[in-house]
């Protein structure tokens, strides 16, 4: 790969958004791992698929389970590990700036 896509500052920025903390060494290691992953995508992107019929596998039959809602009776048990409640709802920290 000629250009770096992920540097230490990018890792630190993403970790801040996701509320994770990494040392400089960890951030450097992660930047290298992300670069390797993106390198694999670049390799895959170079594969010639012009002779492949992309619609060949459209008839996959996936059976889904029924999505049946159930009432959860034990609200106290459900809320026992919640850090913060507001008006009976779970309050979570803002993550989008």
Curated annotation (Swiss-Prot):
<dbReference type="InterPro" id="IPR003837">
    <property type="entry name" value="GatC"/>
</dbReference>
<dbReference type="GO" id="GO:0006450">
    <property type="term" value="P:regulation of translational fidelity"/>
</dbReference>
<comment type="subunit">
    <text>Heterotrimer of A, B and C subunits.</text>
</comment>
<keyword id="KW-0547">Nucleotide-binding</keyword>
<dbReference type="GO" id="GO:0006412">
    <property type="term" value="P:translation"/>
</dbReference>
<dbReference type="InterPro" id="IPR036113">
    <property type="entry name" value="Asp/Glu-ADT_sf_sub_c"/>
</dbReference>
<dbReference type="GO" id="GO:0070681">
    <property type="term" value="P:glutaminyl-tRNAGln biosynthesis via transamidation"/>
</dbReference>
<keyword id="KW-0436">Ligase</keyword>
<comment type="function">
    <text>Allows the formation of correctly charged Asn-tRNA(Asn) or Gln-tRNA(Gln) through the transamidation of misacylated Asp-tRNA(Asn) or Glu-tRNA(Gln) in organisms which lack either or both of asparaginyl-tRNA or glutaminyl-tRNA synthetases. The reaction takes place in the presence of glutamine and ATP through an activated phospho-Asp-tRNA(Asn) or phospho-Glu-tRNA(Gln).</text>
</comment>
<protein>
    <recommendedName>
        <fullName>Glutamyl-tRNA(Gln) amidotransferase subunit C 2</fullName>
        <ecNumber>6.3.5.-</ecNumber>
    </recommendedName>
</protein>
<comment type="similarity">
    <text>Belongs to the GatC family.</text>
</comment>
<keyword id="KW-0648">Protein biosynthesis</keyword>
<dbReference type="GO" id="GO:0050567">
    <property type="term" value="F:glutaminyl-tRNA synthase (glutamine-hydrolyzing) activity"/>
</dbReference>
<dbReference type="GO" id="GO:0005524">
    <property type="term" value="F:ATP binding"/>
</dbReference>
<dbReference type="Pfam" id="PF02686">
    <property type="entry name" value="GatC"/>
</dbReference>
<dbReference type="GO" id="GO:0050566">
    <property type="term" value="F:asparaginyl-tRNA synthase (glutamine-hydrolyzing) activity"/>
</dbReference>
<keyword id="KW-0067">ATP-binding</keyword>
